Amino acid sequence: YSAFLIENNSKMNKEFKNFLSRLEKSKDSSKIEATKKRHKLGYRTARENLEHLSDPDSFLEFGEFAVAAQRSRRDYEELQKETTTDGIITGFCTINAKEVGENKANTIGIVYDYSVLAGTQGFFHHQKLDRITEQAEKFKLPIVIFTEGGGGRPGDVDVMTQIAGLNIPTFSNWARLSGNCLKIAIANGYCFAGNAALFGCSDFRIATKNSWIGMAGPAMIEGGGLGVFDPKE
């Protein structure tokens, strides 16, 4: 019996260490170069935006271990490092609970992470977004969303049956929240395509001076034969 406990404790310790390691990979401390790049532009990281938005230790994250649906062409360890959270942080938090009280402070927080595949919208990314908006509708909670990112992502090759992503419910879900859940969107940097749709269909829209917002990014415009443009044009 003692040997059994020792063996299983050893396995549990290993699994727990792996669990903690996975958690650490999604933090800024594990993305030093990406964090430096953000700060050089004068921007915050997604985690820093979340920290400034929510009350200390109030954020309950959903889907932190998600990675891009690209396992058939990229190593899983690489995906854990390079595509943490699949580019979007979602969860529950409170905002200004000391001022308004815990019940009135409950909020859904959604932050696009531009350091992960330019904040593009992938397969599991959309599933996370759909899940958290369903929770917002269920509990009638306000949403604060940071929408920086480049729209739909073409490289999620693990999904064999999806055509242009037009079968996803994300945008109809977002529209259905109107009149039920307050939606506050913040844009900074590049915000194109699906990201811009979420921004434009929010109740309150806040954009920094360094924002470039459009329903089509440079790649889509060029692909449509309309010419080559810089994203800031």
Predicted regions and their residues:
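Intrinsically disordered, low-complexity segments enriched in small/flexible residues
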Residues: Y1-T107, D113-A118
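A generic local secondary-structure boundary/capping motif
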Residues: L79-K81, G91-F92, N96-G101, R131-Q135, ...
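Glycine-rich phosphate- or other oxyanion-binding loops that anchor nucleotides, phosphorylated ligands
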Residues: I108-I110, Q121-K128, Q162-L166
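Glycine-rich anion/phosphate-binding loops
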Residues: T85-D86, G119-E134
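Thiamine diphosphate
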Residues: D57-E61, E77-K81, F124, V159-I163, ...
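A structural preference for short, pocket-lining loop segments at secondary-structure junctions
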Residues: C93-D113, K128-D156
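Conserved catalytic cores of soluble enzyme domains
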Residues: T147-E233
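A generic structural signal for short coil/turn motifs at secondary-structure boundaries
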Residues: L117-Q121, P154-G155
